[in-house]
């Protein structure tokens, strides 16, 4: 669909920074008002079209919407992503809608969540099935309050380099010698 929710959320956060710059440095109240209005419209659109009710997870964020009631429920490994929302500054880790969304995207209900003998995490429609991205594993750790989960994710990243000692774009959850973009580190 045409409206990517994480991208719009990131834009909302950036507009806050831009507003501060325009207000404090450029002292341009007209431009500041336009920024505030645009941010309001984006946030309103997210609230209106980007939050869905899932029968198992409750209120959660969609990944994409068309603005007509249709939506895509998934998450992609790249940033901005739904998983990265607290890191980006859109919400806190304990936000209920975020936590419901997190439970969804870190489950097999997310079509790009993979689990194997070497790793489990979020992959992408841009790489092969059963491949997870270290960037998503890192973001999962950065947005977790669970020390055991964080340590498990760090170990997963360190132990899945295909014996190259480099992080790659993605790697197979069952065989880390199979990876994409060896120059990606």
Identify what each model region corresponds to.
Residues 1-12, 25, 31-133:
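Extended ligand-binding clefts on enzyme/binding-domain cores
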Residues 19, 23, 34, 102-103, ...:
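Arginine residue identity/basic-tract feature
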Residues 22, 105-106, 139-143:
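Alpha-helix C-terminal capping segments
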Residues 17, 97, 117, 169-170:
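Generic alpha-helix signal with a bias toward terminal, lower-confidence helices
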């Amino acid at each position: 669909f045409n409206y990517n929710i994480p991208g719009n959320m990131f834009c909302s956060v950036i507009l806050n920074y831009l507003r501060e710059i325009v207000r404090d440095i450029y002292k341009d109240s007209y431009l500041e008002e336009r920024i505030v209005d645009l941010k309001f419209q984006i946030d309103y659109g997210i609230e209106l079209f980007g939050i869905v009710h899932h029968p198992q997870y409750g209120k959660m964020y969609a990944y994409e919407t068309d603005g007509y009631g249709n939506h895509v429920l998934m998450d992609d490994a790249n940033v901005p992503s739904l998983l990265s929302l607290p890191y980006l500054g859109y919400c806190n880790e304990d936000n209920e809608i975020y936590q419901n969304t997190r439970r969804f995207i870190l489950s097999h209900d997310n079509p790009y969540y993979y689990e194997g003998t070497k790793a489990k995490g979020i992959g992408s429609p841009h790489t092969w099935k059963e491949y997870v991205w270290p960037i998503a594993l890192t973001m999962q750790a950065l947005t977790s309050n669970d020390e055991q989960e964080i340590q498990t994710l760090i170990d997963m990243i360190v132990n899945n380099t295909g014996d190259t000692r480099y992080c790659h774009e993605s790697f197979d959850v069952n065989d880390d010698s199979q990876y994409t973009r060896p120059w990606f580190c």
